[in-house]
Every structure is written in structure tokens, then in C-alpha cells.
Amino acid sequence: MIILKRLLQDKGAVIALGIIVLYVFLGLAAPLVTFYDPNHIDTANKFAGISFQHLLGTDHLGRDILTRLIYAIRPSLLYVFVALFVSVLIGSILGFLSGYFQGFVDALIMRACDVMLAFPSYVVTLALIALFGMGAENIIMAFILTRWAWFCRVIRTSVMQYTASDHVRFAKTIGMNDMKIIHKHIMPLTLADIAIISSSSMCSMILQISGFSFLGLGVKAPTAEWGMMLNEARKVMFTHPEMMFAPGIAIVIIVMAFNFLSDALQIAIDPRISSKDKLRSVKKGVVQS
């Protein structure tokens, strides 16, 4: 509750959280908040300018850009949420087991992580695309295969730190069950760390799925996706540059929102890292080490 209170006191964090909630709402309620079919082709109305009928105009096939922009939230953001959730779940389970029990279990899980982290995520993604073809599903699978190992390593380090604390040692001494110790004494302490690395990972995952779609290796046409929309706009960027603005700005805004949220979470958990707090302390004549 203290962390949440600090987070809500940060105006930047509140704005970032509001933007993320708005994006998620628009993505889930896309059929309810739009008036057009995102894939409806109207060549007689292509490259239409901004108007009351089309607030952001139309593309080279006469499709409403705003409608496609909203529908693109689903593969660009909501699919990434699913991949992130599965990656964090797998990484957390293995990270807790590795960091708490250590020994043979730790060595076995860490060697598996070494194998997975030996291959760059882009290489794994390209390999899956070569084997199974293009599609968001293969990119999401690649995210899960590469990200779980990274989450596992980070969470393992955090768990090992808390496992060595006095209250956990005391719980072991009195014979408390291992699973109960993890659930009651370690898991609540690591949730904040998991939230920070999850929010920061969202940025790179959104950029990656948009990047692959921009290269024509991600979401298949005619499905609306920000990277795909940028790819389509690239072909007419000199004659109709406005087509690139909407998906580009949408990506920039959501990535900045997750970056701000990640920074705010770190400050909420440990206020000492805030330069503003340090400046106030110096002004008061208090030197913090």
C-alpha cells in the first residue's frame, strides 16, 4: 500500500498508467468505439484527408486509419501482454525454485537459462518464422522462449537475497514448510521487482513485434498492426507522409508510458534513487549516503 501511495503521488506515473489503461480499454472495446470495419476497402475514397467522417483520414485502400489504429492495439499491445504474462509466470516459478533451494536445482535451471540466453531473441524469432511461417503467434512464442530465461535469472537473484534474510532463516529454524515460506515471506518482497522488470520489458517487446511487422515478418495482412501500418505508409511516405504519423506516434506514446511507469515504480520502491529527493535532502543539510 505504501508503494501504491507513492506511485499515485507521482503525476508522471498517474498519466502513464492512465495512458496504458486507455490503450487497453480501446483495444478490448474496439468494435464498440469505432464505426468502420478495419479491413473494409473503399478505393474510391483512398487517401481522404482529415474530416468528421474520417478523423485521421484513410489509407491507400480507403480504410479508416483511426479504426485500424485502434484495432492494431490488439496484436501490438494485448498480444504482448499475453507473452509477457506467460514469460513472467514461467520465469517466476523457476526463479523461485532456483533461488530458494539452490544446489542441484539451481545448477540445473541455470544451465537451461544459459542455453536459452545463448541465442539472441531476434535469431530465435527468425528461426521460428523460417520453420513455421509468418504470424504474430510465432513471434509471441519466440518472446516466451527467450524471455522466460531472463526473468528467471533476475528473479533468482532477488529470491537468493531475501532467502538469506534473518526472518526467512528463523522460519526455516522453526520448521515452517518451504512452500509456505516462499508464499508468505519471499513472494511479497519480490512482487515489486517483478513489476519493474515486467514494465521495462514491455517497451522492447512492443518495439520488436512492431519492427518484425514493419519488415513483413510479423502480423499478416490485412490484420491491423502498428508496424504493418508503418510498412504500408512507407510506400507513399513522400506523397502522403501523414499516414506514418498515427502509428508512429501511437508506438512512441505507449513506449514512453511504460518507461515512465517503470521509472516511477523504482522510485516508489526506493525513494532514495530519486534525484529530487536527494536535492531536497541537500537543501535541508542532510547528506544521504
Swiss-Prot record:
One of its GO terms (cellular component) is plasma membrane. It holds the Pfam family BPD_transp_1. Induction: Up-regulated in metal-poor media. It is found in: Cell membrane. CDD domains: TM_PBP2. Residues 73-262 form the ABC transmembrane type-1 domain. It is a multi-pass membrane protein. GO terms for biological process: cobalt ion transport; copper ion transport; iron ion transport; nickel cation transport; zinc ion transport. Signal peptide: none annotated. PROSITE patterns: ABC_TM1. The keyword Iron applies. Its main location: membrane. Keywords: Cell membrane, Cobalt, Cobalt transport, Copper, Copper transport, Ion transport, Iron, Iron transport, Membrane, Nickel, Nickel transport, Transmembrane, Transmembrane helix, Transport, Zinc, Zinc transport. The chain crosses the membrane at residues 13-33, 77-97, 115-135, 194-214, 249-269. Belongs to the binding-protein-dependent transport system permease family. The complex is composed of two ATP-binding proteins (CntD and CntF), two transmembrane proteins (CntB and CntC) and a solute-binding protein (CntA). Part of the ABC transporter complex CntABCDF (Opp1) involved in the uptake of metal in complex with the metallophore staphylopine (StP). May be involved in the import of a large array of divalent metals ions such as nickel, cobalt, zinc, copper and iron. Probably responsible for the translocation of the substrate across the membrane. This is Metal-staphylopine import system permease protein CntC. The gene is cntC.
